[in-house]
Amino acid sequence: MRILSRKGGKEDYYYLQHSFRKGTKVITKEIYLGKKVPKNINKIREEFKRSLKKDLYERLEKIKKDFQSQWKRMPESARNRELEEISIAFTYNTNAIEGSTITLEEAREIIQNRISPNKPLRDVKETDRHSKVFLNMLKNKGDISNKLLLKWHGDIFNETKEDIAGEYRNYPVRVGYYIAPDWKDIKNLMKSLIDLSNKKNNGNPVELSAIIHYRFEKIHPFGDGNGRIGRLLMNYILWNAGYPMLIIEYKNRKSYYKALMGNEEDFLKYFLRRYLAVHGKKEKKTKN
């Protein structure tokens, strides 16, 4: 998005312009600002962004409406089965992304039947614990807080990462080429993140969940386990706003990591594409 000027006689006329790609075409939209750039240009820019995303927001709202309609029709027993299935798939994928050796079927055996495969005990315990934290998370309708995030982390890792479980780091960390913020800044960074998460009327919840996930991973508040907590946080926001959740699949981990290593806007575009690819298909089925 950029501000440009055009000459009209001796006068300059200012416009706010945005170009984006749609398929193979480049679409350009613009609005007239006046003979000078208004003082409230930031507000105008945000309103312009929202107007450009009108179709997107309508589609996301349709996904939410269809999901809620279907969910309300389901008997409680069917809902519980569905949540257990989501728990299995989500737990398998989120742990596999972080290097777990547990397969999808082994995750099912652990979660449903309490049967432990011949795999590292750490992976078995983290599968069991993550599933329980996820299902308990869905029962919570409260605001996001440091206490909540620390509890999730502690409950998942208190038997496998005892020295760091349930605590924010107090030492520097590096993830590949990325150097996380100084640990002394974590308190303030997390306060800003949590305040944004809980702010009312804070734009579309699907976009918010992506932004919060991205910023959480950049803060990297824990010594380890940030990806799993970040993906729980992402789905907590979606679920409590009435939207279907999103599973970042292990098979798509490369594009996911690539998006996380980019800037926030690029990650948001990636996230929205994935969300619409998964839930947009279900949206189309309801029309047929």
Show the residue positions of the predicted features.
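FIC/Doc superfamily catalytic core
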Residues: 1-224, 228-288
